[in-house]
Structures are given as C-alpha cells and as structure tokens.
Amino acid sequence: MRGVTETDKLANGIFHLVCLADLEFDYINPYDSASRINSVVLPEFIVQGVLCVFYLLTGHWFMTLLCLPYLYYNFHLYSKRQHLVDVTEIFNLLNWEKKKRLFKLAYIVLNLFLTIFWMIYSALDDYED
C-alpha cells in the first residue's frame, strides 16, 4: 500500500512536468495543459491524505512527520483556492509552476526511498525474530 501510493504520486508529479514541458515547447495549447493538470490535482491531494492517515494508524511516526508538511501545503493551497492551474495565467507562471512541481517531485522521491528503506528494514527485522 505504501509503495503504491508513493509511486502514484511520483507518476503524477512526472505527468505534471511533462504537461508543463509540452506547453513550454508549444506541443499543447494552454487549455488542454491546464485541464490535464487540474484533473489530477484533487486525486493527488486525496492520495497524500490517505497515505498520511495510513502512516498514522500503523504507527509509523517518523514517516507521518515527513508527510505532514506536504499535507499542510496541499491543504493550504486548497483552502486559498490556489490548487488549480489557471488557463489565462499559465504562461506567466510557467517557470514558477515547473519549479514548484520539481520541488514536490524531489520531496516525493525522498519519501519513496525512505518508504522502501523502512519496508526492507521491517522485513529484515521480522525475519531475525
């Protein structure tokens, strides 16, 4: 479950960057790019919330603490209604959006590696007992 949601978020982040790169190189129009990105934003937020709750319920406190800043950031964007990409502003904010998505992608990759590490550590610890 943990690895699946982390890889879903990773694929989602890569999808966002590909859409923005396609827009930058004029392979896609702004409306299509914004609608593609906006269609996966809320599922990304839901997956992050479920993952954080899953870590909390299973007693993985360290991973819960690592997921909380990203969850807070997503909640903050959603509450200020800044979570969706605006079609009319997408060209003006293209570099900022790409930087934001790259930072989120790096954060997700770090969480993925830590999740894999803790799964292997837990499996080896159970094997020794």
UniProtKB/Swiss-Prot annotation:
InterPro entries to which the protein is assigned, alphabetical: Cornichon
GO process annotations (BP): vesicle-mediated transport
Membrane topology reported for the UniProt record: Multi-pass membrane protein
Keyword Lipid biosynthesis: no
Compartments in which it is found: Membrane
GO CC, alphabetical: membrane
Predominant cellular place of this UniProt entry's protein: membrane
Chain segments annotated as transmembrane: 45-65, 105-125
Keyword Membrane attached: yes
Record keywords: Membrane, Transmembrane, Transmembrane helix
Family label: Belongs to the cornichon family.
Protein name listed in UniProt: Probable protein cornichon homolog 2
Originating organism: Arabidopsis thaliana
Taxonomic classification: Eukaryota, Viridiplantae, Streptophyta, Embryophyta, Tracheophyta
